Regions:
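Domain-level signal for soluble alpha/beta catalytic cores
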Residues: 1-354
Length: 354
């Protein structure tokens, strides 16, 4: 069966209700056992699924409601990390303090639960090797085991590939590696703040890590997600994608998901350099703006992208996850209404262009 034009998906996370945030933090601080938390979350996750289905989203996630954040989940499930010892970007992150080792599924159990409750396509999300190295390598505590960030990144690759095999077995249709660092490097202020001295080296390293993680993967659609990073409804960087477009053309992946609804990403003109065979995940809903876009506004954004990318290669999704960590103060109803508008825009576009 042919894939319809303008399919809809999400990037990963949905806003977490207060009681779900409490579950995650109580589990983290030991006030609730892992088993007790999972039992409660088994009641919560179907709500996240139902929201997406009612909004008309065709490829769904579990809202990442079982996770504290999109990136910390790696350290929570993989041996070798100590929690919240590494201040990175002004926030506490885990740090690698021992050789990392695949111990149990990172996201496969999430997917298996979701597969038992939906017939829709399912997207699984994992952090990229590069973002793990950037966020979880500590210049003092990690160096006895991993003398460089690169050495930690290299050890992440086989762990991620093993998890992708588990995700396929669990029923995932798409594996998306989240790689915000590649796009935030377009901002010279961000590069200076994070001590990025050789941006070409960093981009090449990022591309190499993504290719090592995804090269040769079959039986599941491969995707990466880029964004300008956000916290508390504010972006952490800004700038058009022109600087990184040559790097995107070197990544061996089926779908590249990018922000284009937010003004901080610049205009659609950068899509003139987008890889010619790769599908574009088009961010067409601004997750940082409380304004709920009309379907017509979204259609207009998609049609602007069609000036550069064939309609058969365009997938619709929000710019980013609505709540990459439990701290993000986004409204669940707002997310639903934005997703509903996006699905209606897809319907309008299909009627017009199919």
């Amino acid at each position: 069966m042919a894939t319809p034009l303008f399919p809809t998906t999400v990037i990963g996370s949905l806003p977490r209700p207060a009681w779900v945030k409490d579950l995650i933090l109580d589990r983290k601080e030991g006030r609730l056992s892992e088993k007790e938390a999972e039992q409660w979350l088994d009641h919560a996750v179907p709500v996240a699924l139902a929201l997406q289905e009612r909004a008309g989203v065709e490829e769904v996630t579990d809202g990442e409601w079982r996770r504290e954040s999109y990136v910390k989940v790696f350290a929570e499930r993989v041996i070798g990390f100590e929690k919240d010892i590494n201040p990175s970007g002004g926030l506490p992150y885990p740090g690698a303090v021992a050789p990392i080792e695949y111990h149990r599924p990172i996201a496969a159990d999430e997917i298996r639960f979701l597969r038992s409750r939906t017939e829709r396509r399912i997207k699984a999300t994992l952090p990229s090797p590069f973002i793990i190295g950037r966020r979880m390598w500590h210049p003092e505590l990690s160096t006895k085991i991993y003398p460089t960030r690169e050495s930690l990144m290299n050890d992440c690759v086989p762990v991620i590939r093993k998890e992708i095999d588990a995700l396929k077995e669990a029923g995932a249709d798409t594996i998306q590696l989240d790689e915000p660092w590649l796009s935030v490097m377009v901002d010279p202020t961000f590069r200076e703040k994070e001590g990025v001295e050789d941006v070409d080296y960093e981009m090449d390293l990022c591309v190499d890590m993504l290719n090592q993680a995804l090269d040769g993967i079959t039986g599941i659609t491969t995707a990466i997600h880029l964004c300008h990073a956000h916290f508390e409804r504010r972006h952490g960087s800004e700038g058009p994608y022109d600087l990184i477009m040559p790097a995107l053309n070197k990544i061996r992946v089926e779908i590249i998901c990018m922000e284009y609804a937010t003004p901080v990403a610049g205009g659609m003109e950068s899509l003139a350099q987008f890889p010619g065979e790769t599908k574009l995940g088009l961010g067409c809903v601004d997750h940082c703006d409380p304004h709920v876009e009309t379907p017509e506004e979204i259609v207009d954004r998609v049609e602007k992208a069609m000036e550069y990318v064939d309609k058969e290669r365009i997938i619709l999704h929000p710019d980013c996850g609505f709540s990459p960590s439990v701290q993000n103060p986004m409204d669940l109803d707002e997310a639903y209404l934005k997703l509903k508008s996006m699905s209606e825009a897809s319907r309008i576009l299909r009627e017009k262009y199919d």
